[in-house]
């Protein structure tokens, strides 16, 4: 009797397993091997260039930006167009500045052509929406690396290109010598920025009553400041130095107060979820720093063509003297992309001297670690 019940229970168990296997097989045919079935209402994300994911540029929003950029032949770079020294348009209408040059660095590494860039000016409030939607491939727009931008905003920041801090600019003939002197004042500030938040934190901690006067872009903010609608203008000190250098009444008409009241590490940002693109952009940036450490510039690059240093030879994409191979780190870039970056755009020092030095800003934290700064390139091997 017991054996009959055991046989019956075994038969029931077998039927249950068979039914489960059939159900699993149906799901597999619908969704593909090892994948969850797609939601029927989901629409394809929009990629850089405006096409849906799956189209010519579809990978740009769905996780294959490197391939999409190389297929398109153009890098779409989100930038600022109103900050002297960092991102602006010159007298001829051409984009120029430190951030603009790093867009060119990325294009040189990825496409072999620093001019293959479509610059897309964005306001502070537009920038992360443009990045998330795929309107731009990369954001190089004096943007601070923060936890919420890394998390909530969906950005992923590469190596920092400029270490900055927030300051306050006032008219030279004003009575203000410190932030504590600015009780009951109106402060011009860009909306949707860490600057706005830092201002509230610092003035709140100092019990300094003030009226924030927010603007969406630097142009309207500067107009308000020139019209004396604000007593002070707060932003990253590098940006204030840029504005001061090109102020209509001359730089001596303005003063930047001594206090720095925030940390502002600035650098390129890409979308989360695309590690290959992150790696490509990150190592393009690192190339400029490594070149400076090696002492390689756009002017003396040819002197290293027959270098005896195996480390530099590897970095330049030269054949190994030992086995004749060329090192490929698997970044999806040409083996000599470092050389291309330096040859066509320059090393970090050249980029800095071209754009930031004229503003009167010392290297400080933006010097190599060997000179007391924070620029420290990781090994290329």
Q: What residues fall within each predicted segment?
A:
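Extracytoplasmic small-molecule ligand-binding "clamshell" domains
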Residues: 50, 57-139, 333, 368, ...
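Bacterial N-terminal signal peptides that target proteins for export
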Residues: 1-9
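Acidic, polar ligand-binding/catalytic clefts
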Residues: 104, 108, 112, 116-181, ...
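Extended ligand-binding regions for polar small-molecule ligands
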Residues: 23, 42, 47-55, 59, ...
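Bacterial lipoprotein signal-peptidase II cleavage site
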Residues: 22-35, 51
